Amino acid sequence: MSKMEPYVRPSRLLRPDGSPDNNDRVEIGPTQLAFNEWRELGLTAPNLEAMRHYRLDRIVQQLQAQDLAGILLFDPLNIRYATDTTNMQVWITHNHARACFVSADGYMVLWDFHNCDHLSAHLPLVKEVRSGASFFYFETGDKTAEHAAHFAQEIDELLQSHAGSNRRLAIDKIEIAGLWSIEALGIEVSDGQRVMEHARVIKSLDEINAMRCSIAATEAAMHLMRDASQPGVTENDIWA
């Protein structure tokens, strides 16, 4: 992972996965070594831009089919599916400091941890990056209800802007203070996990290519670990 200045002009050259061939950026993903190995195996790298558009379209289709105004996501895996962003995945699984809102018209807002805007600077589908989705006791203490109420007001404003009179919002997982604050504004909450699981049901060709490449990389790593596992060798030596 390298550092990206947000005002650097994007490179016109593309890598096999459709990403700009510019190392002066923050973006998770494979290196040239992986691209070379996949090519030798006869595998096709996924086009990440196309995959991101496909996933957003799948979410929007589910929202429209269920007459939902939008969906609010806190599960880091669901946020990754919707935005292709990641940040402190394990910590965020326990402490919901990130969130994502997707409206039925495809407008996407990401709440990231403070000072982390650069992590999504390369993603044009993320229309806004905000902070302030933290309303759990470890972070906000006795002011949790206050923080939750402020966040709920932001959601209410987004619904009014993008859904008019539709007050039906899907949520996957949320801290109880946030749920209370959202429902107090007259917003009807429904199951967001159902929406996301149905969105994932049909895979695109790029998603299938991504899985094939991921499996190949994992299998290669496991073979290396197996070959390095010898009597008297420590786990640290194997990982190294």
Language-model regions: role of each:
Residues L48-R52, Q230-A240:
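Signal-transducing coiled-coil linker helices
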